[in-house]
Amino acid sequence: GARAAYQVGVLLAIRDVWGKRPGNPFPILCGTSAGAVNAVALAVFSANFDEAVRKLAYIWRNFRVDHVYRADTLAIAESVMRWGSAVFLGWLIHQSPRSLLDNSPLGALLESQLDFGAIDRSIAAGHLRAISVTASGYTSGESLAFFQGHEALQPWRRAQRVGVRTQLKVEHLLASSAIPFVFPAVPASTRLWRSST
């Protein structure tokens, strides 16, 4: 997260040079984890770089922990109970907890702030060539690059790397931001990959 906030500082400096010109100085955007959130925000607002950077700066300046995960007493107690049950009664309940923290607030924030349909409109208007969000396949060991872009761009497969053409959504950002044991892995990343190929 700290690196993503730093990225916005760099974007503010670039915005000062770019000025109020329409469009976007970055035709290809890529990101992982919180950097993927920044990249998708730039893609969504790529018709107006100044507006995109202003919105990103506003979000990062007002960012709080409860925008990412539930930090209330009830959520922490539920997590302690889930993990305690798994440690002491795991043989009996046959279910492991998915993660230490519940990051559903992050999903809700992204859903409310990002119009993913704007990505196709930006590509069609020529403001954007492609956007890629990379996630790790923890069971496969593959790096999954989910991309949306110009029709000439093709999916790819290399050693431990797969490029998957798709319509980006919140699930891709959550998959990219997953941290083993801390934030839940997104089982949908495998499903999203299989349904896109």
Residue ranges and their predicted role:
Residues 1-2, 139:
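Short polar catalytic/cofactor-binding loops
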Residues 2-98, 104, 110, 147-159, ...:
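Patatin-like phospholipase
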Residues 106-109, 114-118:
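Extended, Lys/Arg-enriched charged tracts that mediate electrostatic binding to polyanionic substrates
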Residues 107, 124-197:
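Active-site gating loop/helix substructures
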